[in-house]
Amino acid sequence: MRTAPVVLAHLDDEAALVEAARKVSDLTHYDPEAGDACVLWCLAIRHAILTGELDARLGLQHIDIDRRNLWSTRLDVAEASQPSDFKNNGWVVEALQGAWSAIARTPVPQDDPAMGVFSVDHLRLALNTAVRGGKDTDTVAAIAGGLLGAAYGASAIPAEWRRLLHGWPGLATRDLAALATRIVKADKPFSYDIEPMAPVRHPHDDGVWLADVAALQGLPPGVDAVVSLCRVNDDDLPAGVEQIDVRLIDRVEPDANPNLDFVLTDTVRLIEQLRNEGRTVLLHCVACQSRTPTVAAVYGARTQGMSGMLALQGITSVLPGAWPNSDFQKALERLAP
């Protein structure tokens, strides 16, 4: 049931995905019901990636007609039950039911940016529900997480979790994200041509430095954590320093930052967590003109109890060239009115 990577390889070909899902399942679980479950879940993941919708039923047409009604009933039961009701969740059928139950029965929060509540919190809440169902929790959570991540995107994963996330052998979060990007053939080389600036201290917290990407070549004294708001090449990562990537795109387009308010808030929570650990933080983007000032302003607003726009004035006092794009400014007003 850990079939999400299969989906990425066949996003543009539903028929090929159905065939691949069943063949991969057959490698270890030759029971046709195991193949059915993988087909259903793979098609649900594909649909979620392409549309953002959560629907476990759309793949029923690809299930043998003799078992189709049975699977429909099983999904009905999942939606009427709690994950903990599926005691035999090491079996693929009940594992799928437990995962779908956690997703379907966990309410999607109503967005309230100023209160720090977001609809994408559904990913975190539903995964918590899946784990608390008990028994074979890693399987159920892996199944649920594949679909939730497909619907909400990597930017909906809390930074606190991303700091812990890892793969084998020795893969960190950024490595796993890069692997997924390569599977969908979206990886492209990149470089930056900027005029380097001198890092400056945050006006409301001298343990936070604001900088451009060039600062990675020579960190300010004492910096032991880096929060990157732009893409960073592996070769540019400073040695011996924890680095956390944040997906924040400096473009004013509807699909550029689907989870913008959450990402800004979550990044500020990350900085607060790092500071509470006694870390000195470097916050940077490419040129320190739009993304970094925005996050720095949200951080200042939260720590000082002021409006976002007033906090931004403080940021521009140390970064005169700061000018967050219009979407970022609107988000700043929503998050810290």
Explain the meaning of each model-derived region.
Residues D12-A16, D111, H122, Y152-L165, ...:
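Phosphate-handling active-site elements
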Residues R22-K23, A80-S81, F118-T137, R269-V281:
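Short, hydrophobic/aliphatic alpha-helical segments
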Residues G133-I143, L147, C285-R291:
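Glycine/serine-rich anion-binding loops at beta->alpha junctions
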Residues A151-Y192:
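Conserved glycine-rich phosphate/nucleotide-binding loop
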